[in-house]
Each structure stands twice: as C-alpha cells, then as structure tokens.
Amino acid sequence: MESNSKISLVGLGNMGTALGHALLKDQKQLTIWNRTASRPSVTSLVDAGAVFEPDLSWTISNSPVTIICVLDYPTIRQILYPIVNSHALKSKTIINLTNGTPREAREMKEWMRHAIFDGGTIATPDMVATPASSIFISGENEQRFSSVTNIIEVWGRAQYVGQDPGAAALNDLALLAGMYGMFAGAITAMALLKKQKSGSREHSGVESQVTGMLNPWLQALLPYHAKMAESIDRGIFESLGNPIQMQSIGMQNILKACDEEGVDAGSLRYFAGLMEKVVAERSGEGGIAEVVTLLLK
Ligand code: FVH
C-alpha cells in the first residue's frame, strides 16, 4: 500500500485546479507544476497550501503519485518524454486524467514503461468532489488500483474498468459521445423552437420550453436507451413498438420542417441517412437500434 498523503499535480488548467483544491481540502500535501507559473490558478492553489515547483522532474520526484491533467496527449509527450528515463520517475505511479483516445493511452503505457493508470473524468470542474462526479480508471491491475483509490475518491466515484490502459478512455469517450449526440439534437430542437411564429408560445422563451417540455421528454426516454442496448447485446432488433420505417418518416419530417423554417439540421441528417439505409436494406420492421449494424466497422 502506497502512502498517499503526498501528491504531485501537473497541469493547472480549469480541471487540474479543481482536482488540486479538492486534494488540499482532503489534507493532502500537494506539489504542483504548470507551464505558465503566472496563471491565477497557481496562486490560488499556493494560497490554499500547495507548493509550486518550477522544475517538472522535481515535482514528480517529490511524491509517490503524480496526477497529470493537461490539454492533450501530445502535450504529455512533449513534457514527459524528455525525462522518462530520469531518476525522478523511478518507482513512481502516474495517474493521467488528460482526455484522449484508447490508442493514445495504450501508446503512453508503452513509452512510459512506469506504473500508470489512465483515467476519464465524468465531471466538469464544478462537479469535482460532488456526488455527480465519477472517474473511470484503467491500467495496471485491480490490486494496484486499490492502492490509489483513496486519491480518486476525493474527486468522485472511482470505477476500475480493466487492465487495458485504453479502457478508461473508451468508456469516457463513449459517455461523451452520448452527451454530444444529445446536445446536437437538443440544440437543433432549440433552434426550431426559436422559429415559432408570434402568437404562439415563443414569448415565454426557449428556456421555459426546454425546462417544461424537452427535458421531461428526454428524461422519459432514458429507459428506451436500455432497451435498445439490450437489443444490441442480443443482436435481435425488435421494434419495441416503434418500427424504424415509421421512425424514418418522422425523421424526414423533422429535416423537411427544418428546411422550411430555416434551421440547419445537418447534425441529424447523417443519422437520418442511416435510418433510411436500414429501411431500404432490411425489412424496416425492426427497431432503431438496428442502425448500430451500420456503425460497427
Ligand atoms: N474542463 C472540463 O470540463 C473537462 C472535464 C473532464 C476532463 N477534461 C479534460 O481535462 C484536461 C484538462 O482540461 P482543462 O479544463 O484543465 O483544460 P485547460 O483549462 O485548457 O488547461 C490546459 C492545461 O494544459 C496545459 N498545457 C497546454 N499546452 C501545454 C504545453 N504545450 N505544455 C505544457 N502544458 C500545456 C495548460 O498549461 P498553461 O496554458 O496554463 O501553461 C493547462 O495547465 C483536458 O484533457 C480535458 O479534455 C476537462
């Protein structure tokens, strides 16, 4: 079991800063490094008790565990590769919370060669250390993961998702894909609502319609996701009472209405094309989850 009272933190952007403040509140001794020392977040962490170290090697050598939270993997490679064989990293554990692809995480394990966990943070900086926050972790093994769980749990619910270094990134990006898909549809809906003619409810504003109608509708649909996922697991795409042929006509009506009302529905158009392809190539009596067969390469 590693002693986790001393932690180093590399990268003090919005996310790194939130992670750092949560660690300080948990009474950790924190050594911090950031490319730009003059960033106000550096001052805020030093004021809260962190020690700023201008040298990256010293920062890492100061604690058994170092958290990395920078912009992207090319940045990690740029700052860490030059010191990867130095004494500073010997016997250290790295927890990388930088967003990236599964392949980038696997490649990092290759060139890093030290103990490294890769993480996906399912939280915005404001959510860190609240019940809404959870963190996927992968790499090494579950036993070694248990030696760093007490750090991860400072920020949110810790979920170990496997030894494959890329597993956390895959889970993280899958959730974000769901989020951006939802945003794409929701923002198209908001644009359409914005086009309401005077005399209708546009004076109440888009926000009240989103709160009063769109959000309850999306919330009511969440169990449908689980039913679609079950179809995907079984490879049998029942209609679930809503055959894709019927849904495809509804989708075409959305695209047509957007054209008529002056809304760009491009973010839905590609998906509508996939639905049409399923209808054209299959019976059209199955469910919308059958689209997944066109996505899997
Ligand atoms: N913020 C969010 O909502 C999400 C929540 C989920 C996780 N993401 C990922 O976390 C990584 C860091 O995100 P961030 O929000 O902290 O990002 P920024 O505020 O833009 O800070 C970027 C830090 O990266 C440093 N940096 C950038 N380029 C370099 C470089 N060439 N060399 C050294 N450091 C670099 C930057 O340093 P500086 O500009 O202050 O000198 C910041 O410390 C990210 O992967 C998210 O996807 C956030």
Residue ranges and their predicted role:
Residues 1-68, 92, 154-160, 191, ...:
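NAD(P)+-binding Rossmann beta1-loop-alpha1 motif at the extreme N-terminus of oxidoreductases
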Residues 42, 63, 73-76, 105, ...:
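A general structural signal for well-ordered alpha-helical segments in protein cores
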Residues 56-68, 72-135:
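Rossmann-like NAD(P)(H) cofactor-binding subdomain of soluble oxidoreductases
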Residues 99-180:
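Rossmann-fold dinucleotide-binding core
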Residues 167-264, 270, 274-295:
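Helical "substrate-binding/catalytic lid" subdomain
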